[in-house]
């Protein structure tokens, strides 16, 4: 008898998970449609939906004008996307950026704070927590926080090594934030989150093998292989580090140009590149040459990634993706000349928001796993 009871309980949980996944797809559905899609009886579907309504994971939709027919109108349901919120945070050397989203991934608020690469680790932690607290739309609804950070991040959320922010090396980031934030906290490498965002809502949607090239105040890579994020055996996949002279020297031409034209202004590498791009768009031939030299340096480095990995797509992302054809076209021409199977090269439309948006997706994925496990 206990075995029968246990089997029935397990079956109900499996059916609940199936119905919740259907609702999670975003469509408005009737009980009949739910029952058919989940392959359960209509009474079973109705009982599960009532339970999901009580737990606020589902909501009943109002009847739309023109729906009324003879008899009782069909009840219609959808996933209750506003029942909770998640926050995605991009921790960079020069900025902290947060995005608050509902469970459907709709962005509710965005906040940005400028920081210095030399900021001590303890102060950076405080700034992250303060940003999260400021980003909370409704404290009762906050369900998870995900953080993307530069550097090698292991499975425990520890920053094993960070070239861009040396002070960050060795910080137990997930553990430190979990002590200060009262909801589940996830930590991942920023470049992996950037390519995740592109695959979710960017130019890489529908692609399975993608190289994401980050261009900002530094250079980084994110890899999607076979439709999955590639972390590597030491979670160091995509790290350029300080051994790649080609990438370290990539900024030299745009920095030299900016210092020559406007020597009184102190700029970061990314700001120097942005300055050169802006001047190139205005018709400055010297600026255009500096930007093309920058693009070719990037392309030379990409060759060593593209030939062995054979991706379908290269996404040029980060703050400098706004350069568009000024970066993309020289890179595409070089890859066309020297790679076995040249991938398409495109500029990201997400710009500097990709890491925070990828963190939102990571938090939502965590909630989905938790929710379906609890249901099933």
Question: Which sequence ranges carry the predicted segments?
Answer:
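Phosphate-binding/catalytic loop of phosphoryl-transfer enzymes
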Residues: 89, 103, 141-148, 152-249, ...
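ATP-binding/phosphotransfer module of carbohydrate and carboxylate kinases, centering on a glycine-rich
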Residues: 1-114, 118-141, 181, 201, ...
């Amino acid at each position: 008898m206990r075995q029968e009871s246990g089997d029935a309980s397990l079956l109900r949980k499996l059916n609940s998970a199936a119905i919740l996944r259907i609702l999670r797809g975003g469509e408005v559905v009737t009980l009949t449609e739910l029952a058919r899609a989940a392959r359960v009886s209509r009474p079973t579907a109705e009982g599960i939906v009532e339970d999901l309504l009580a737990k606020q994971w589902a909501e009943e939709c109002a009847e739309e004008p023109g729906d009324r027919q003879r008899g009782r109108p069909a009840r219609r349901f959808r996933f209750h996307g506003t029942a909770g919120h998640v926050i995605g945070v991009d921790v960079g050397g020069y900025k902290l950026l947060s995005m608050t989203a509902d469970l459907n991934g709709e962005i509710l608020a965005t906040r940005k704070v400028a920081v210095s690469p030399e900021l001590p680790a303890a102060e950076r932690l405080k700034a992250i927590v303060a940003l999260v607290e400021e980003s909370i739309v409704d404290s009762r609804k906050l369900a998870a926080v995900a953080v993307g950070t530069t550097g090698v991040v292991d499975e425990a959320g520890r920053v094993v090594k960070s070239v861009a922010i040396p002070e960050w090396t060795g910080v137990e980031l997930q553990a430190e934030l979990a002590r200060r934030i009262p909801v589940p906290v996830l930590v991942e490498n920023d470049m992996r989150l950037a390519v995740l965002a592109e695959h979710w809502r960017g130019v890489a949607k529908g692609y399975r093998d993608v190289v994401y090239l980050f261009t900002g105040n530094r250079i980084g890579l994110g890899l999607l292989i076979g439709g999955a994020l590639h972390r590597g055996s030491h979670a160091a996949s995509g790290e350029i580090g300080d051994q790649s002279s080609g990438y370290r020297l990539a900024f030299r031409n745009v920095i030299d140009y900016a210092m020559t034209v406007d020597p009184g202004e102190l700029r970061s590498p990314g700001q120097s590149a942005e300055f050169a791009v802006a001047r190139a768009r205005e018709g400055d031939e010297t600026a255009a040459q500096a930007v093309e030299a920058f693009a070719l340096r990037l392309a030379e480095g990409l060759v060593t990634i593209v030939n062995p990995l054979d991706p379908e797509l290269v996404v040029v992302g980060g703050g400098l993706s706004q350069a568009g054809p000024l970066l993309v076209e020289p890179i595409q021409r070089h890859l066309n000349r020297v790679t076995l199977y040249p991938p398409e090269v495109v500029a990201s439309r997400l710009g500097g928001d990709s890491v925070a948006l990828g963190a939102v997706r990571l938090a939502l994925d965590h909630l989905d796993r938790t929710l379906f496990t609890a249901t099933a």
